[in-house]
Amino acid sequence: ADIFGPSVPKMFQVEDARPYAEQIDGRDLIIPIEKYGIKLLSIGFFVDPDQATLWRGGMASNALKQLIGDADWGELDYFILDTPPGTSDIHLTLVQTLAITGAVIVSPPQQVALADARKGINMYTNDKVNVPILGLVENMSWFTPAELPENKYFIFGKEGAKQLAEEMNV
């Protein structure tokens, strides 16, 4: 499930797919799009991908609840949610709505982004939330141009997520 954008439809190359509703046990449920054996729902299926999603916290939280609760997910091995960076109403709604068994924090290596990752780790490990951090993934670690495949350019810094993981015992 992807709350704010077209990321999931783009990554799975299903931008033109449209989920539909089906009545199951007297309830109208959204049938997720399925690709590669993975069930997908994203706000990107319901809004124009070129338009900004301008929602206040409550609207975004309600959309998240609908993506989670009003869909026929069936039996799942894992339920993965792509959330925006930081700590927001979305994250609070998530931990209040689902019994979360773990979180994976994704961050590029630059210090500004790592500050958000640090806040996310602190939020999930807070005594009131108590969600274990399963790992910290460094995204956009380096750039390799096609014409120089042996070169790596660390344009956002180097090993920032690794340093944060060590600092926070993740």
PLM region spans:
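Walker A/P-loop phosphate-binding motif and the immediately C-terminal alpha-helix
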Residues: A1-F4, L136
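Helix N-cap/coil-helix junction residues
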Residues: V14, W73, V129-V131
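Internal, well-ordered alpha-helical segments in soluble enzyme and binding-protein domains
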Residues: F4, A60-L64, A113
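Phosphate-binding loop that captures ATP/GTP phosphates
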Residues: I3-D50
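Switch II (G3) loop of P-loop NTPases
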Residues: R18-Q23, S42-T93
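Residue-level signature of catalytic and energy-coupling elements of molecular machines
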Residues: V8, L41, L64, D82, ...
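Conserved catalytic-core segment of NTP-binding enzymes
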Residues: D77-Y78, P84-V170
